[in-house]
From Swiss-Prot:
Source organism superkingdom: Bacteria
GO cellular component: periplasmic flagellum
Cell location: Periplasmic flagellum; Periplasm
The keyword Nucleotidyltransferase is assigned to this record: no
Cystine crosslinks: none
Protein name, as recorded: Flagellar filament 32 kDa core protein
Reported function: Component of the core of the flagella.
Subunit structure: The flagellum consists of an outer layer composed of repeating units of FlaA around a core that contains one or all of five antigenically related polypeptides.
Family, similarity comment: Belongs to the bacterial flagellin family.
Main location: periplasm
The entry's keywords: Bacterial flagellum, Periplasm
């Protein structure tokens, strides 16, 4: 389940960096 948390953070970072 910890991996899921990491994926969520990476997803948010990707969205922010895409802007």
């Amino acid at each position: 389940m910890i991996i899921n948390h990491n994926m969520s953070a990476i997803n948010a970072n990707r969205v922010l960096g895409b802007t």
